[in-house]
């Protein structure tokens, strides 16, 4: 029988030399030629039609590589071939293949019989095939039609062998009426066969079009889909994978020129042997599904294939700022941390911005203009006259500071020789009248104070001039300040910075002592001659997105035909005399209202003081002038300790003064005292931009007005969000529970239906309930009417009865009732069924006592007959017995638990006996 089963497998060809010529790369166990090889018959010797395909010719001697091979017989078409054209054709031979593997012998010969005279040769590859068939068809088969063995990695010749075996098994079972050990067929139309035998055990869970939902099968199908095109390319190239790009280009031109070759279906492609190319691919899809690791953000600058259109994927990369010029960002980490620690408790919100190191000029010089620069227009009343008090003697010795080229924030600009000072008109004196002290060669105190007070700007008689803390004088100043005017806009970009400065103008910040009349201290900026060497270090603004609206006044940049000296008066701010030793100064004016966001102070390599007040309080009736002052220490002080940087963003408050805030800084550096309204950004009608906190990572910019959100507000927001989420979950749970209840009420089956169908059936169900309720209400109304009619009839009948009945004494009546109860008790204790009988006859006893009279024998005879006629007839007894049984069923457990009825009967007669004893 085993021979009959395995005869369907293709036999090894007799011409090995031709096999080598045609398919040198296929091993012997994968040979699929259908030329038969003779085998000795089994011990049974039964010749069956299953051997019709076997050849009885004796095997010729095997031809060596140099022998002449005999002519090959024409191939036999088996049943499993069906409509497959050229099922034995394999891909062309590859270069450098080992031809010795073709001559490998995989056939195993088995000897059996008493004298081992019978031999049977079985191909070893059939074992694997039948294992696959057992795995795929572990149940019963229905028909011998062609089976694709979906989900199994089989080649076409293996599928043909398996289908031949299945067809042979069907032939043996139905035509030869014999059993076979491989496959068994059942007929669904046969009534004796259980229907469950046709069900595949793997078909319990379906997934898409596959009837087996194992992950290995899904991965294998994914590999087929992934490697199909690459295998198509391998038809046109050798094993050298380096020529894959050239083949891609060749196929691309073939596509546009000669057109594509007609694609072969994936299942019929002879190249779909996934063992060949799985080593060339790294499976990343299912490995990431199993590990559940978060995908890292790709760095587009590390991708080598940015030029290939297939590698470019859409994303948020164009929205990211360019970080190439932020290579040296480490010095600002301490700046952020120290600023939050120092000023965290002073202001409700702080906005930190990276302040660059003035010693680090970048390699980019072309951002700043060097020729035509705008001038600054100021009111005439604010410009100092040429006859102002003598300025402090300034040391004109220039300072050339060293710089690092890797810092991209600092823009150096060389200044040429300064021009003569600009003459200013007289009206400056009434506003700023202060004598100037002579310079002192001694160094200033350790902690000078730089108060910043927003007073009324243009009022000649200010109502409340503030006092200053520690007014100092300029010591031996070895610096040459410069002035930069900076026009702020809503959005600052590094492409077109709105920055203008005077290239050939050096200005000296001079201060005056307060007059005895306590006039408001002002700041006069006068030009001074500078040597051609000092360099102004310019802080290039980083792109910052300012939210909160557009500024009130438009920003204009007026170009000048030539560099002109500029004289500036800083308005809306008071800067007390402070000592700056040995460093050149720069003043940057920023036009535009800025809300006070916070204070930033940290220690950097050079002493920098950044002061940016804007739109501070003004006197009534005076037009508002928005300005900001940036005082930057630009010197290269080798002997002085590092000084902090403080940036003040004043708010657009309307009240004159607020609480004074004093910020102590590190030793040796000037102190900055801020006196101003200490409150958050007011929600006023005017639009004023808010500076956003520049975080180190450009991925997460914070565009809120406050650079650092309040933890209480964050906690409240999270609490409110959690409440919203909880309420939403409760709402959805209630809706789901109500729909489940509706489904349980309106539908008998457990099949899930849509909400629309559920609501429609609910409406129908409610309508039916309303109709039933109306019918019940109508029935109750009708029954009430009948009860009223019956009560009226009973009352009318009772009115017709006589007022007196049979003359029976009360004592005699009670005595007869006691005798009846005693009799019932005695008989019930003997047999509990008598208690049921006593309940039935008790109405008869009552009627007997009322009708029968014992006054005389004739009267007794007459009343007894009358009682029998009236109360003992069947029409009277039937409803009486029925009512008695109804009372029995309601007062006892005769219907629910009849076993307790004897106990209840004994208890009833016992109660009757106790009542008799008490009476």
Curated annotation (Swiss-Prot):
PROSITE patterns reported in the protein's UniProt record: BHLH (PS50888)
Chain segments carrying region Disordered: 1-72, 542-562, 633-712
An annotated Gene Ontology molecular function: RNA polymerase II cis-regulatory region sequence-specific DNA binding
Region annotation Leucine-zipper: where it falls in the sequence: 769-790
Cell compartment(s), UniProt: Cytoplasm; Nucleus; Mitochondrion outer membrane
UniProt entry tagged with the keyword RNA-binding: no
Role: Binds DNA as a heterodimer with MLX and activates transcription. Binds to the canonical E box sequence 5'-CACGTG-3'. Plays a role in transcriptional activation of glycolytic target genes. Involved in glucose-responsive gene regulation.
The organism of origin for this protein: Homo sapiens (Human)
GO cellular component terms listed in the entry, alphabetical order: chromatin; mitochondrial outer membrane; nucleus
Subunit structure: Efficient DNA binding requires dimerization with another bHLH protein. Binds DNA as a homodimer or a heterodimer with MLX.
Residues bearing PTM N-acetylalanine: 2
Chain spans, region Transactivation domain: 322-445
Biased amino acid composition, Polar residues: 670-685
Tissue expr: Widely expressed in adult tissues. Most abundant in skeletal muscle.
bHLH domain span: 719-769
Keyword Aminoacyl-tRNA synthetase on entry: no
Biological classification of the source: Eukaryota, Metazoa, Chordata, Craniata, Vertebrata
One Pfam family hit: HLH
Superkingdom field: Eukaryota
Name under which the protein is recorded: MLX-interacting protein
Keywords, ordered alphabetically: Acetylation, Activator, Cytoplasm, DNA-binding, Membrane, Mitochondrion, Mitochondrion outer membrane, Nucleus, Phosphoprotein, Transcription, Transcription regulation
Mediates heterotypic interactions between MLXIP and MLX and is required for cytoplasmic localization: annotated span: 832-881
Annotated InterPro entries: bHLH_dom, HLH_DNA-bd_sf, Max-like/E-box_TFs
Phosphoserine modifications at: 9, 27, 33, 39, 669
Spans annotated as Required for cytoplasmic localization: 73-327
Acidic residues bias (residue ranges): 27-37
């Amino acid at each position: 029988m085993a021979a009959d089963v395995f005869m369907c497998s293709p036999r090894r060809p007799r011409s090995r030399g031709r096999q080598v010529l045609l398919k040198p790369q296929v091993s012997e166990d994968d040979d699929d030629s259908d030329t038969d090889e003779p085998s000795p018959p089994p011990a049974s010797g039964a010749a069956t039609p299953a051997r019709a395909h076997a050849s009885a010719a004796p095997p010729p001697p095997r031809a060596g590589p140099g022998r002449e091979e005999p002519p090959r017989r024409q191939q036999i078409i088996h049943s499993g071939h069906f409509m497959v054209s050229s099922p034995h054709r394999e891909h062309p031979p590859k270069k450098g293949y080992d031809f010795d593997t073709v001559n490998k012998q995989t056939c195993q010969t088995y000897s059996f019989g008493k004298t081992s005279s019978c031999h049977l040769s079985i191909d070893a590859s059939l074992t694997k095939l039948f294992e696959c068939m057992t795995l795929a068809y572990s149940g019963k088969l229905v028909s011998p039609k062609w089976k694709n063995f979906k989900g199994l990695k089989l080649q076409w010749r293996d599928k043909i062998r398996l289908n031949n075996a299945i067809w042979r098994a069907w032939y043996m079972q139905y035509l030869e009426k014999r059993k076979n050990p491989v496959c068994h067929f059942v007929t669904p139309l046969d009534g004796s066969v259980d229907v469950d035998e046709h069900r595949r055990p793997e078909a319990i869970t379906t997934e898409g079009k596959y009837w087996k939902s194992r992950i290995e099968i899904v991965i294998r199908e994914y590999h087929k889909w992934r490697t199909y095109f690459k295998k198509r390319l391998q038809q046109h190239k050798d094993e050298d994978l380096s020529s894959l790009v050239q083949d891609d280009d060749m196929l691309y031109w073939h596509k546009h020129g000669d057109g594509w070759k007609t694609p072969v279906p994936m299942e019929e492609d002879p190249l779909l042997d996934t063992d060949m190319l799985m080593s060339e691919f790294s499976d990343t899809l299912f490995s990431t599904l199993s590990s559940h690791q978060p995908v890292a953000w790709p760095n587009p600058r590390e991708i080598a294939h940015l030029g290939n259109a297939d590698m470019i994927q859409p994303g948020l990369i164009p929205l990211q700022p360019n970080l190439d010029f932020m290579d040296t960002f480490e010095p600002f980490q301490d700046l952020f941390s120290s600023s939050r620690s120092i000023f965290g408790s002073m202001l409700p919100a702080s906005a930190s911005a990276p302040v660059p190191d003035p010693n680090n000029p970048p390699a980019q010089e072309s951002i700043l203009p060097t020729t035509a620069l705008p001038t600054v227009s100021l009111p005439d009343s604010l410009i100092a006259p040429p006859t102002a008090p003598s300025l402090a003697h300034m040391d004109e010795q220039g300072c050339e500071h060293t710089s690092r080229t890797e810092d991209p924030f600092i823009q150096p600009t060389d200044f040429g020789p300064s021009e003569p000072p600009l003459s200013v008109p007289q009206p400056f004196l009434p506003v700023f009248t202060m004598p100037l002290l002579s310079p002192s060669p001694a160094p200033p105190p350790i902690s000078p104070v730089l108060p910043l007070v927003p007073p009324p700007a243009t009022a000649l008689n200010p109502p409340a001039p503030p006092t200053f803390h520690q007014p100092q004088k300029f010591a031996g100043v070895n610096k040459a300040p410069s002035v930069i005017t900076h026009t702020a806009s809503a959005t600052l970009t590094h492409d077109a910075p709105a920055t203008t400065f005077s290239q050939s103008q050096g200005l000296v910040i001079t201060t005056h002592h307060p007059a005895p009349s306590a006039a408001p201290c002002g700041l006069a900026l006068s030009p001074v001659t500078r040597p051609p060497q000092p360099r102004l270090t310019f802080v290039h603004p980083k792109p910052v997105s300012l939210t909160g609206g557009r500024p009130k006044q438009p920003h204009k940049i007026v170009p000048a035909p030539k560099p002109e000296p500029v004289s500036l008066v800083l308005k809306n701010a008071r800067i007390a005399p402070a000592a700056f030793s040995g460093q050149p100064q720069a003043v940057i004016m920023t036009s535009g209202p800025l809300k006070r966001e916070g204070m930033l102070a940290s220690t950097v390599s050079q002493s920098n003081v950044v002061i940016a007040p804007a739109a501070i309080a003004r006197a009534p009736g005076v037009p508002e002038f928005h300005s900001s002052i940036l005082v930057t220490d630009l010197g290269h002080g080798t002997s002085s300790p590092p000084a902090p940087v403080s940036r003040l963003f004043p708010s657009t408050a309307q009240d004159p003064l607020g609480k004074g805030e004093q910020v102590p800084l590190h030793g040796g550096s000037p102190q900055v005292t801020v006196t101003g309204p200490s409150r958050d950004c007011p929600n006023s009608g005017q639009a004023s931009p808010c500076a956003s906190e520049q975080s180190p990572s450009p991925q997460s910019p914070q565009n809120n007005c406050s650079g650092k959100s309040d933890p209480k507000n964050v906690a409240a927001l999270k609490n409110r969000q959690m409440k919203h989420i909880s309420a939403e979950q409760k709402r959805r749970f209630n809706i789901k529970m109500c729909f489940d209840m509706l489904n349980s009420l309106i539908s008998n089956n457990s099949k899930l239906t849509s909400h629309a169908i559920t609501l429609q059936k609910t409406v129908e169900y409610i309508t039916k309930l309303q109709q039933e309720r109306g019918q019940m209400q109508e029935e109750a109304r009708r029954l009430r009417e009948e009860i009223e009619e019956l009560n009226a009839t009973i009352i009318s009948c009772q009115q017709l009865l006589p007022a007196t009945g049979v003359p029976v004494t009360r004592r005699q009546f009670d005595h007869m009732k006691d005798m009846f109860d005693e009799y019932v008790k005695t008989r019930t204790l003997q047999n509990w069924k008598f208690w049921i009988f006593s309940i039935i006859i008790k109405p008869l006893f009552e009627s007997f006592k009322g009708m029968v009279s014992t006054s005389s024998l004739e009267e007794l005879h007459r009343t007894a007959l009358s009682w029998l006629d009236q109360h003992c007839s069947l029409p009277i007894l039937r409803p009486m017995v029925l009512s008695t049984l109804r009372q029995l069923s309601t007062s006892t457990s005769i219907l629910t638990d009849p076993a307790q009825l004897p106990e209840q009967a004994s208890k009833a007669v016992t109660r009757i006996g106790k009542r008799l004893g008490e009476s």
